[in-house]
Amino acid sequence: MSKTNEEVAVISTSKGEMVVEFWPDVTPKTVENFKKLANDAFYDGTCFHRIVKGFMIQGGDPLTKDPSEEGRWGTGDPGYKIEAEFSDQKHVKGVLSMARSSDPDSAGCQFFICLKAASFLDGQYTCFGELIKGEDILESLGDVDCGGEGEGSRPEERQ
């Protein structure tokens, strides 16, 4: 799914490629973690498993590599958690942020990209980069047909 080079990553999807630029000066540990996972091919074969129209697309779960695990998608992790790195950065369209549970220090590998501003996440989720290429791809992913709502909002086709 992702390849990194310096401070950018290419995220390949069924709709095309998106390029995100990291903010290592804002969230160094989160950027380091994402880059390590991407460079170790951790994200290869994963998909965007949760799409909430008008909000965000979420990916990075290693369980999405196996369609037989679909009932558990959204629960996968790399075997560890990282500490939150909250900042003054805003969750606006195209911002890359870490997904987590209700525990602020529970992020590991799952991430999301905002489809529009989500100020209610500001200061509560670790945003660590932004989309610099592929806004049309982001919008296309955000418009795919999904089943379910909220936590269970899954694209009907693999993304």
Question: Where in the sequence are the language-model features?
Answer:
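Cyclophilin-like peptidyl-prolyl cis-trans isomerases
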Residues: 1-159
